Amino acid sequence: MEEIAGIASGIEYADTAEESDEIIHVFEMLSELKEGENLILKAVGKLFRSFVDARRMSLSADEFNITYSSDSGSTNPILFERGLFLDICHAAMAATPTDLNLHRKRTIVCTGFNPAGKAKLPGTEDWKLFDDGYGRSKMIQIDPSLLKIRAGRMVHDYSIYSSESEHILWTQADMDTNGFFIMDGPLYPRQLMYWMGTNSEKVLIRHDKNAKKILQNYIDIMDFHLKNKMPVVGFVKNPAETQIMNLLRKKAKEEKIFAELPWATDTQMFKALLKPEKADTGKASAAEAGTGKAGTRFKITYTNWFLQLKQYYDDDIKTTSPLVEESLTHSFEPEDYTVAFFAVRVPYENSSVVFKIESLYGLIKDEEMRRRSTQKILYELSAGKIPETLLKADSIAKIGGDEKKEIQNLFTVDKSYNTFRWGDFDEL
């Protein structure tokens, strides 16, 4: 162990406290970032970095009388000995203030895949009601000809995205459109959309009816929010994209404009740009600006909103919105469905984390909607590290270990050496 520590301590690493002109230049480039003629990133409104004092923000009034959040719990893919992949996902919706009837509603989707086509799931793909109609479940079977690789991942994606989207659509009638809706994770089913937009001979879901139905569900969800002008955000807890950094690094090499770009991901870049001592470009109040270094542990720092294009599909797909399928129906202009986001850095257990907050360009292109959506998220993060209603939804939707073991006991699980060495663990 001493040798391991010695190797680690010998790695040269520097974290410059002072903000260099290069870092400032990086941020300024985010105002409009192109790859050739293609626009990749564009600031919506003014480019800025700012902060709020969490202590003051938590004492302010919430502009929204009710907040909704959705989440889906999963067994995660289970491989059984006769080649059957199975994943069961359980979706729920939470509200603050609490709405017990809404919390009681549940949607369960089970997806199966067997490459030999021998294992058939019971029943049909129609909904089966339970709990006096407050719950419903259905099964999806992926055709064996569609997948040569990524079977476990696809079984999971079908289950989690279907359960989430179907449950949101089912509970929209219970929503007060003057409220605020927080989705767990990105706005759209990113993994599924990638493969729907890729000409792959090994993952042939592009024209699969179930994949199309899932994507149509998400477009229908966004139509509801655009029609009612009801704010919706995707709260991405662990953003890991590299689209912006890849382009910046390419430009740095071609145009010789940066000596060094040390970040591996977009999140690392935003984390550096949002260090508390750097994130005051005039947006903070006079009282907040006077908090000084001693108050940095209470500072929540954030950027302006950005329009982010070309993040879902390969270059052979020309659209920049999720409307890759011509058969998808939608009520608004394609650009309105494009994802916009802002980054926010939050103090967290003697360190800090960066969250990505997504919304629809069709909503946040309105300045007042941008302001209200930003303020709502800052208020939620000042009151707790994760929005309260999102934590509620996570608790309601979670599938416990006992339930997972009960499912496993119905079949013979295919165990590898790692199963015996580490026990039951999740691997997608």
Language model region names:
Residues 74-81, 86-109:
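Active-site cofactor/substrate anionic-group-binding motifs, chiefly glycine-
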Residues 70, 91, 182:
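Generic enzyme active-site microenvironment
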Residues 95-151, 155-156:
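Compact, glycine/acidic-enriched structural inserts
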Residues 2-54, 60-61, 66, 149-180, ...:
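Long, contiguous domain-sized segments
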Residues 2, 90-92, 142:
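N-terminal functional modules and adjacent low-complexity/disordered segments of proteins
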Residues 66-76:
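Two-metal-ion RNase H-like nuclease active-site motif
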